[in-house]
Amino acid sequence: MKTTFLDFEQQIAELESKIEELRFVQDESSVDISDEIKTLSEKSLQLTKDIYANLTPWQVSQVARHPQRPYTLDYVGGLFTDFHELHGDRTFADDQSIIGGLARFDSQPCMVIGHQKGRDTKERALRNFGMSRPEGYRKAMRLMRLAEKFSIPVFTFVDTPGAFPGIDAEERNQSEAIGRNLYVQAELTVPIIATIIGEGGSGGALAIAMGDVVLMLQNSTYSVISPEGCASILWKTADKASEAAEQLGLTAQRIKALGLIDKIVAEPIGGAHRDYDVMMANMRKALSDSLKTFDGMKEDALLERRHERLMSYGKFKEITVKA
């Protein structure tokens, strides 16, 4: 699959294009230009390292939305075995922006739930671009309750711009569905391990992200609103999205500094989409280490740990500033 380059990666794109041209020439002739190819490849790698070491929050947002970034079904295929998808909320419909089902992780039975955006136009429409309606969240809630019944851990993968804001979603009580999911996650008697793999957009993300362990990929985002949405409200124009991204503090490093997540999962150089194998290996270790935290932990201890975690959010200290 040919890599899609973002606007700020155009220098890398030009180098990679030259490398491809040289490889074609070498394949079609007897001329040995392997040294030139090696030199350009090293230059491209170093340039990628330099650019990705200094990404702005707005650039991180673009990487988090990259169309070739691994989605939930990619992680399901790369990390889990015996996946059996379960459908529907048993109330209204099967929202395909959220997928979920029974699986095994390192031979251990588990439940997997996550957003799915879609790769092409047809699938994106089917998945509603990863923006869930109430029936999607109710499906997730049903699967969480099923995991509790079977006493198996829950793995969630978050990648959504936010909950769908359409009239039909509001008619079916979108806010209640999200709020109910938060309630259920707070009292669920099995471990929940949540990972932000792309966009973590507002309540639409939080509805399946209230984990006992919360991970974030290095170039993912987690925020109450998108940069464009924030800019449209504050400055009446989406052109200020870059400035809004700076103010929102949506990067993994910023969220970790606030104590809202537990660990940042490293991505391959150039983003998760550049090397699926490396990304899967990094993710497998992060999930495995997280799951070991709950080995032998009793339900009461699990719930106490979770409630302490939730109650620690939003604490502040008053200080007196001398004039």
Swiss-Prot record:
Pfam family, one: ACCA
Subcellular location: Cytoplasm
Catalytic activity: N(6)-carboxybiotinyl-L-lysyl-[protein] + acetyl-CoA = N(6)-biotinyl-L-lysyl-[protein] + malonyl-CoA
InterPro entries cross-referenced by the UniProt entry: Acetyl_CoA_COase_a_su, ClpP/crotonase-like_dom_sf, COA_CT_C
Domain annotation CoA carboxyltransferase C-terminal: ranges: 40-293
PANTHER family on file: ACETYL-COENZYME A CARBOXYLASE CARBOXYL TRANSFERASE SUBUNIT ALPHA (PTHR42853), ACETYL-COENZYME A CARBOXYLASE CARBOXYL TRANSFERASE SUBUNIT ALPHA, CHLOROPLASTIC (PTHR42853:SF3)
GO terms (BP aspect): fatty acid biosynthetic process; malonyl-CoA biosynthetic process
Lineage: Bacteria, Pseudomonadati, Pseudomonadota, Betaproteobacteria, Burkholderiales
Alphabetized Gene3D superfamilies for the sequence: 2-enoyl-CoA Hydratase, Chain A, domain 1
Signal peptide: none
Domain of life of the native organism: Bacteria
PROSITE patterns: COA_CT_CTER (PS50989)
Pathway(s) where this gene product acts: Lipid metabolism; malonyl-CoA biosynthesis; malonyl-CoA from acetyl-CoA: step 1/1
Source organism (scientific name): Polynucleobacter asymbioticus (strain DSM 18221 / CIP 109841 / QLW-P1DMWA-1) (Polynucleobacter necessarius subsp. asymbioticus)
Coiled-coil regions, chain positions: none
UniProt keyword annotations, A-Z: ATP-binding, Cytoplasm, Fatty acid biosynthesis, Fatty acid metabolism, Lipid biosynthesis, Lipid metabolism, Nucleotide-binding, Transferase
Role description: Component of the acetyl coenzyme A carboxylase (ACC) complex. First, biotin carboxylase catalyzes the carboxylation of biotin on its carrier protein (BCCP) and then the CO(2) group is transferred by the carboxyltransferase to acetyl-CoA to form malonyl-CoA.
Family assignment from sequence similarity: Belongs to the AccA family.
Any one GO molecular-function label of the UniProt entry: carboxyl- or carbamoyltransferase activity
GO CC, alphabetical: acetyl-CoA carboxylase complex
Subunit organization: Acetyl-CoA carboxylase is a heterohexamer composed of biotin carboxyl carrier protein (AccB), biotin carboxylase (AccC) and two subunits each of ACCase subunit alpha (AccA) and ACCase subunit beta (AccD).
This protein's name: Acetyl-coenzyme A carboxylase carboxyl transferase subunit alpha
EC number: 2.1.3.15
Lyase as UniProt keyword: no
